[in-house]
């Protein structure tokens, strides 16, 4: 037991020293570490995207964070259940799309209004089984467990209607 305790203490001390050395090295190289202490919503990043205006959009497990080079503005998801927002993409209508990896769903954020948009579909089962997403030439594509689909968007004031058109079954 004493050997195990000594090993754990040694590993913890080594980790703390290496973290301190890493932070010092980053500062010397002009690299700024950004964390919750700087305003980031969560230290766990699951996606990153830079938009045309230069803002960095960071996916975390509590929502999106927008970084302007100085400040963070956080857009937390409504429910408090952890979600990994990955694969961030933007379409020309200022919508930021993200895959919610741990739920196999997608999220849509309206950058102009600063809100998450509800997604409505006549085939909701398609929206419950998304493995990955991609935006190509302003079109949203999704990979499900048994098909590749193009998701056609119709944006209303309060919601986005999605219809799925299978490309490959």
Regions found by a protein language model. Give the residues of each.
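Carboxylate-rich, polar loop motifs that coordinate divalent cations or form catalytic acidic clusters
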Residues: 2-169
């Amino acid at each position: 037991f004493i050997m195990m305790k000594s090993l754990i203490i040694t590993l913890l001390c080594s980790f703390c020293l290496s973290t301190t050395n890493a932070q010092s090295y980053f500062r010397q190289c002009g690299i700024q570490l950004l964390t919750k202490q700087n305003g980031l919503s969560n230290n766990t990043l699951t996606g990153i995207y830079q938009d045309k205006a230069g803002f960095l959009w960071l996916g975390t497990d509590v929502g999106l964070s927008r970084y302007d080079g100085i400040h963070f503005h956080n857009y937390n998801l409504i429910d408090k259940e952890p979600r990994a927002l990955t694969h961030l993409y933007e379409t020309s209508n200022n919508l930021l799309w993200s895959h919610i990896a741990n739920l196999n769903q997608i999220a849509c954020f309206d950058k102009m209004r600063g809100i998450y948009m509800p997604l409505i579909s006549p085939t909701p089962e398609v929206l419950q089984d998304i493995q990955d997403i991609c935006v190509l030439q302003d079109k949203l594509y999704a990979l499900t467990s048994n098909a590749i689909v193009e998701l056609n968007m119709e944006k209303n004031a309060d919601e986005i209607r999605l219809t799925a058109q299978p490309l490959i079954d």
